[in-house]
Amino acid sequence: MRHPLVMGNWKLNGSTHMVNELIAGLRKELSTVDGCGVAIAPPAIYLNQAKHELAGSRIALGAQNVDVNLSGAFTGETSAEMLKDIGAQYIIIGHSERRTYHQESDELIAKKFGVLKEIGLIPVLCIGESEAENEAGQTEAVCAKQLDAVLNTLGVKAFEGAVIAYEPIWAIGTGKSATPAQAQAVHKFIRDHIAKQDAAVAAQVIIQYGGSVNDKNAAELFTQPDIDGALVGGASLKADAFAVIVKAAAKAKKA
């Protein structure tokens, strides 16, 4: 049985004070929660501080991006080996903001996926369609293309122990969210697409929902059979709201 994972993507938010305060709040709110994996991805500059603040807790450390290179003349980048060295486990790749603002291609993201697997880190592969693609009925085609970039270069076994986050771009930071039924349909398509090559791999892969998940809509989303937690943006910056989402995932998947 799949173990749900709720991960907080802090994006470009944080300060030394906020890291201390938010993690203290999370530790308090989540101290008794069982049955749901939890991870946070602060900005890279705060990873070491977050690692120390998380010590002894069950909250895993994540990161928001990685470079394809392990070392060398790549100013401003962070390698998979560095992330592993500092204690990060879950690494977000392919987020729509990276695809849009940094023109990251499916091919580059597949390379990042491969590097993370090679180093022993867990890729959190973000896929999803824009509003125009959604309205044109291209959701499944877009998701398939983004998955195939990994499947065709690394093979289906690469998804063993990996995480996929379906993030409809039109729902990120907009307050809009897919209905539970809409989200479930896409999550099922993603799992079925992988199952065409290996049903066992498809059955174990965690597929998070990442489109404006908050403390109000989480419980209903998590009742869906193929939604295995969430990649949370804005709500992950508030300990109480994030805790509601984690608790909803733990409760729904225990039922």
From Swiss-Prot:
Q: Report if keyword ATP-binding is assigned.
A: no
Q: Where in the cell is it found?
A: Cytoplasm
Keyword set includes Transferase:
no
Top EC class for this record: isomerase
What molecular function does GO assign, one term?
Answer: triose-phosphate isomerase activity
EC number(s) for this protein? 5.3.1.1
- The cysteines covalently paired via disulfide bonds are none
Q: Which reaction does it catalyse?
A: D-glyceraldehyde 3-phosphate = dihydroxyacetone phosphate
GO cellular component terms given for this protein: cytosol
What does the subunit comment say?
A: Homodimer.
**Similarity remark:** Belongs to the triosephosphate isomerase family.
> What is this protein's name?
Triosephosphate isomerase
Which species is this record about? Answer: Yersinia pestis
Question: Quick one: which gene encodes this?
Answer: tpiA
